Amino acid sequence: MIKAPVVDDRPATIFLICLFYAVHMVEEFSFGFVEWGDRYFGSFDWTQNLIGNSIFFVCVALACYAYYKNPVKYLWAGMSASMWILANAFLHISATALGGEYSPGVVTATFIYVPGGLYFLNRWRTRGLLTLQNIIVPFFVGAMLFMLVPTFARAIHFHA
């Protein structure tokens, strides 16, 4: 019998990303993300925000669950969730810096998403798993497919 590599001796910690997301949503919902998003990304309302965040939350939770059940097979899913929160943080921080106004969500993005995402990447790095081969798919799935491309496509489509 071949011994499988240990990717993570505490795979349940990946669910912290779901907690990070929930706290981030509280900041966004409480401090006017929809109104801010309407100005920056065009034609944005509460229904779209709730549907979009529900879809994102389900995808992140499923990625975390898959990783939890089988970290070896679904390392890419755990890494994708981590890349997703880092990409979201990048958008909030850059929008605040470039727009010169508070982007609802930037506080949790800066103080929870960035350290949280880096925490997981560092855990994988210490196990020798943070290789170019291992991060290409998670970067494209988590950062590009689920965050950056839809955000910029929406802004271009609505001429925001």
Tell where the protein language model's regions lie, with residue ranges.
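Core segments of transmembrane alpha-helices
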Residues: 52-66, 85-89, 113
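Membrane-interface loop-to-helix entry segments
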Residues: 45-58, 101-115
